[in-house]
Regions:
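C-terminal substrate-binding subdomain of Rossmann-fold SDR/epimerase-dehydratase oxidoreductases
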Residues: 4-12, 25, 32, 38, ...
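Glycine-rich, flexible loop/turn motifs
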Residues: 49-52, 96, 150, 156, ...
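Residues in well-ordered alpha-helical elements
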Residues: 73, 85, 97, 104, ...
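The catalytic Tyr-centered alpha-helix of NAD(P)H-dependent dehydrogenases
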Residues: 151, 162-169, 199, 203-207, ...
Length: 347
C-alpha cells in the first residue's frame, strides 16, 4: 500500500476511527472518496474494534495508526509525515455511566485530547499556509444542551446546559474548537448528533445491551420508569451528515444532526423484544418478560430531541432510512456477529 502524498488529492486525519461511529464513517467515506487518504488514529481502548484496524489496513486509501490523541509528539509526527489537510474528530469517551464513575478520564480524553489535536492542526496549517482552508470538524452531541421537558426541540441556538461529566467534557471541547476558530482563524465546523444506533456499537450501550440480555435470557435493565426519551439516528445517516458538513458547510458553522425519531427507553426495549420474538424465537417465552426496572442513575436526563431544520435547509441533508427498517437491520447484524458481545467492558 502506497502512502505517498502524490497518490492522493488530500489527506484527512480521522480520530477514533476504530470506535462505533468512527468505524462506520471510515468504511463509508473511504469507499466514496477513493482519492482522499484517511489516517485513522485510535488508541484502541476497550470500546474500539481491533478488527477494524485489520480491515482498514487492506484498504488502499486508509492508514490505521494506534496512538493517543493526547500525545503531542505523535500528533506532530502524523501531521508532518502525511501532510494532513483536514481533521474529523470522533475520538472520545462517551458512556455517561462511566463518566459518573471516572470523570477525570473523560476530561483527559475529551478536553485535553481535543486541545492537543487543535494545537497540532494549528501549528501544521500555519506552517503550510492552510489555516483558513484546511477544515477541522468536531463531532459533538446533543447532550451538551442538557435535558428537555415533554415539549420543545434542541437547535443550534440552544444554550449549553450539560448535566453529566460526559456532556460537560464535550461542551468544553466544543468551546475549545470555537475558541481556536476565533483566536487563530482555524476553519472549524461542529455537529451535534442525537443517539446513534447500528453495527459495531459497544455492548454497554442501550440497544446492544437489550439484544445481548435477550439472547442470554437475562434481565434487561431499564432505568427508573423507562419513560426517558431519546432521539435515535441510524449511524450511516450520521456518516452522510458528517460527510456533507465536512465538504460543504461554511467555516464556523454548527449543525444539529437528527432523524427526529423519539422513543421512550421502555418502548424501544419492547420493540427490540418483539423483533427478536420473530427473528430468534425463544420457545415458550416472549423476550419482554425479561424487562427489569432498576434504580435510576444520577442526573438521568428526561428527554433529548433535536430539530434537523438547519442542516436540511442549508445543506440538503436528510436521513435515508426508516427507524423500523434500520433497527431490524441492526438486529440482523448482531445476530450474525454474536462475537461482538464478547467485547471487553470499560476499564
Amino acid at each position: 500500500m502506497s502512502t505517498g502524498s502524490s497518490d492522493f488529492e488530500k489527506t484527512i486525519l480521522v480520530t477514533g476511527g476504530a470506535g462505533f461511529i468512527g468505524t462506520n464513517f471510515v468504511d463509508y467515506f473511504a469507499a466514496r472518496h477513493r482519492g482522499i487518504r484517511l489516517i485513522d488514529l485510535d488508541a484502541l481502548t476497550y470500546a474500539a474494534h481491533p478488527e477494524s484496524f485489520e480491515r482498514q489496513a487492506a484498504m488502499p486509501n486508509v492508514v490505521p495508526v494506534q496512538g493517543d490523541i493526547c500525545d503531542a509528539a505523535l500528533l506532530a509526527e502524523i501531521f508532518e509525515k502525511y501532510d494532513v489537510s483536514g481533521v474529523i474528530h470522533f475520538a472520545a469517551e462517551s458512556h455517561v455511566d462511566n463518566s459518573i464513575a471516572d470523570p477525570v478520564k473523560f476530561v483527559r480524553t475529551n478536553v485535553m485530547g481535543t486541545a492537543a489535536l487543535l494545537d497540532a492542526a494549528k501549528r501544521h496549517w500555519e506552517k503550510t499556509s492552510r489555516l483558513a482552508s484546511a477544515r477541522f470538524h468536531h463531532i459533538s452531541t446533543d447532550e451538551v444542551f442538557g435535558t428537555l421537558g415533554a415539549e420543545g426541540l434542541f437547535t443550534e441556538n440552544s444554550p449549553y446546559a450539560p448535566t453529566s461529566p460526559y456532556s460537560a467534557s464535550k461542551a468544553s471541547a466544543d468551546l475549545l474548537v470555537e475558541a481556536y476558530a476565533k483566536t487563530f482563524g482555524l476553519n472549524t465546523t461542529i455537529s451535534h448528533c442525537s443517539n446513534n444506533f447500528g453495527p459495531w456499537q459497544h455492548t454497554e450501550k442501550f440497544i446492544p445491551t437489550v439484544i445481548r440480555k435477550c439472547l442470554a435470557h437475562e434481565p434487561i435493565p431499564i432505568y427508573g420508569t423507562g419513560l426517558n426519551i431519546r432521539d435515535w439516528l441510524w449511524v450511516e445517516d450520521h456518516c452522510s451528515a458528517i460527510e456533507t458538513i465536512f465538504l460543504h458547510a461554511r467555516a464556523g458553522s454548527r449543525y444539529v444532526v437528527s432523524a427526529q425519531c423519539e422513543r421512550t427507553n421502555l418502548e424501544l426495549a419492547r420493540t427490540i423484544c418483539a423483533l427478536l420474538d420473530r427473528l430468534r424465537p425463544w420457545a415458550g417465552h416472549n423476550y419482554a418478560e425479561l424487562i427489569d426496572f432498576v434504580t435510576d442513575r444520577p442526573g438521568h436526563d428526561f428527554r433529548y430531541a433535536s430539530s434537523a431544520a438547519r442542516i436540511r435547509d442549508e445543506l440538503g441533508w436528510q436521513p435515508a432510512g426508516s427507524f423500523e427498517a434500520m433497527l431490524e437491520r441492526t438486529l440482523d447484524w448482531y445476530l450474525g456477529h454474536e462475537a461482538a458481545f464478547n467485547q471487553p467492558q470499560s476499564r
